[in-house]
C-alpha cells in the first residue's frame, strides 16, 4: 500500500491538524522584523547556509515546552545589536478557528532576570504548557545525526523530548528531579549532620524518579506498539526496535509505583557512602539509556552506516509524530532541518509521501533547491536570504 494511504487508513478520525498561517518575528536571531503569510501544509525554506533557515524553525519550536530545537539559552535567541529581547507571534488555523499565539523574552531591565513570556490571543499565558491545547511540535535536526553513537545523555534528552510532546508536564518533572539530585549530592558532599535532611531529599528524589521513569517507559511502550502495528520490512525508512534500560525502569516495570519508590529510597540510603565518594548519585533515571536497533537487519543502530542511521532516525521521528497525534488528538507540526541533504531521490520521494500522509503541516529547510523540485505543486517554497524571506521561483 502507498505510504500516504497507509497513514490515512491508520489515523483516528477525530484529529485536528493545526497549521501556521502567519509568522511574525521581531529581533529574533538574524531577523530584525519578519511578517510571513503562509497558505500551505508543506512549507519549504531554501537558501545558502547561514541565511537564517534554521532560525525560523527554532522560532516555531519555542512554542513547545523546553528550550527549542537548538537547546539554546533564550538570551542567545535575541538579535545581536537588538533590544536584548525578542518576540514571536503565530496565527494558527485549527479546529477552533484561528488563534494567535505569542512567545518572547523581555528586554533586560537593570539587574532583573529576563522573563520568558507566552500569550494566547494577546492574553498572558502561564507557560508553554498552556499552548499545548492549540499545537504540538516534533522535529529532526542535523544535531541529532550522532544520536545513536553519542553518549547516553543525548538519547535520554531525545527520549524526554518524545515524552514531552505527548505529556507537556514531563519537562517540569525532569527539571525537578535534576534539582532534587543536585540537592542530595550537595548534602552528601557536606556530610549533613542531620540525617532527616538526607531522608527528605531522598524521598523527593524517589518520588520524582519513579514518575519520570514511568512516563518514559509508557511512551516507549506506546511507540513500540505503534511501530509493531505499522512496520514494513521493505520500507525505505526502516522500523526501529527500541527499549529502555535502567535500574529504576526495571523497578517500575516489576511493581506498583509506591513500592518502586520505597525500594529506590532504600537503594539511595544503602548507597550513600558510595555516592558520596563518587560525588554523584550513581543509580537513577539519569543513568538510563534508550537502546535502538535497526529492525529489518537486527543490528544495533550504532553499528549501521551513516545513511542507515539517518533513515532509521527519520522513521522513528515519523512514528513519534503519529503517536503524538493518536495520544493528543492533535497532528503535530513537523520541523525538518536539512532533511533532504543526505537522501537519494528515491528516499526523498518516499519521505515526502510519508509527510503528506501524516496529515499535518510540515516545515523543511535545505540549501539545494533541486532536492525539493517535485514539491513545486504541493508546497509553498520560500527563498531565505539574511534577514529576509521571499517567494521562491
Predicted features by range, described:
Residues 90, 361-367:
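Structural recognition of the conserved hydrophobic beta-strand(s) that form the central parallel beta-sheet
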Residues 337-339:
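Walker B catalytic acidic pair
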Amino acid at each position: 500500500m502507498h505510504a500516504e494511504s497507509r497513514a490515512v487508513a491508520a489515523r483516528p478520525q477525530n484529529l485536528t491538524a493545526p497549521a501556521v498561517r502567519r509568522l511574525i518575528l521581531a529581533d529574533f536571531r538574524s531577523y530584525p522584523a519578519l511578517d510571513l503569510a503562509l497558505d500551505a501544509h508543506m512549507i519549504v525554506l531554501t537558501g545558502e547556509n547561514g541565511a537564517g533557515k534554521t532560525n525560523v524553525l527554532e522560532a516555531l519550536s519555542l512554542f513547545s515546552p523546553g528550550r527549542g530545537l537548538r537547546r539554546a539559552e533564550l538570551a542567545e535567541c535575541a538579535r545581536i545589536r537588538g533590544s536584548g529581547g525578542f518576540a514571536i507571534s503565530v496565527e494558527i488555523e485549527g479546529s477552533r478557528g484561528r488563534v494567535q499565539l505569542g512567545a518572547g523574552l523581555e528586554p533586560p531591565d537593570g539587574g532583573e532576570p529576563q522573563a520568558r513570556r507566552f500569550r494566547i490571543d494577546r492574553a498572558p499565558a502561564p507557560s508553554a504548557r498552556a499552548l499545548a491545547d492549540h499545537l504540538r511540535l516534533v522535529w529532526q535536526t542535523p544535531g541529532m545525526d550522532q544520536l545513536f553513537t553519542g553518549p547516553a545523555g543525548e538519547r535520554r534528552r531525545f527520549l524526554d523530548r518524545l515524552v514531552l510532546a505527548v505529556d507537556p508536564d514531563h519537562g517540569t518533572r525532569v527539571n525537578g528531579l535534576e534539582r532534587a539530585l543536585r540537592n542530595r549530592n550537595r548534602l552528601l558532599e557536606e556530610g549533613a549532620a542531620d540525617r532527616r535532611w538526607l531522608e527528605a531529599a531522598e524521598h523527593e528524589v524517589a518520588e520524582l524518579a519513579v514518575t519520570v521513569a514511568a512516563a518514559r517507559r509508557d511512551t516507549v511502550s506506546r511507540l513500540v506498539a505503534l511501530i509493531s502495528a505499522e512496520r514494513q520490512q521493505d520500507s525505505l525508512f526502516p522500523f526501529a526496535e527500541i527499549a529502555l534500560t535502567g535500574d529504576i525502569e526495571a523497578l517500575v516495570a516489576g511493581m506498583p509505583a509506591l513500592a518502586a519508590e520505597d525500594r529506590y529510597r532504600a537503594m539511595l540510603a544503602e548507597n550513600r557512602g558510595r555516592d558520596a565518594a563518587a560525588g554523584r548519585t550513581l543509580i537513577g533515571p539519569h543513568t538510563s539509556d534508550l537502546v535502538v536497533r535497526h529492525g529489518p537487519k537486527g543490528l544495533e543502530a550504532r553499528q549501521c552506516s551513516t545513511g542507515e542511521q539517518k533513515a532509521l532516525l527519520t522513521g522513528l521521528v515519523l512514528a513519534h509524530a503519529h503517536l503524538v497525534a493518536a495520544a493528543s488528538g492533535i497532528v503535530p507540526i513537523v520541523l525538518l532541518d536539512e532533511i533532504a541533504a543526505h537522501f537519494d531521490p528515491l528516499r526523498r520521494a518516499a519521505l515526502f509521501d510519508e509527510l503528506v500522509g501524516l496529515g499535518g503541516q510540515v516545515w523543511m529547510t535545505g540549501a539545494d533547491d533541486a532536492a525539493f523540485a517535485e514539491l513545486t505543486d504541493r508546497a509553498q517554497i520560500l527563498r531565505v536570504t539574511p534577514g529576509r524571506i521571499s517567494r521562491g521561483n
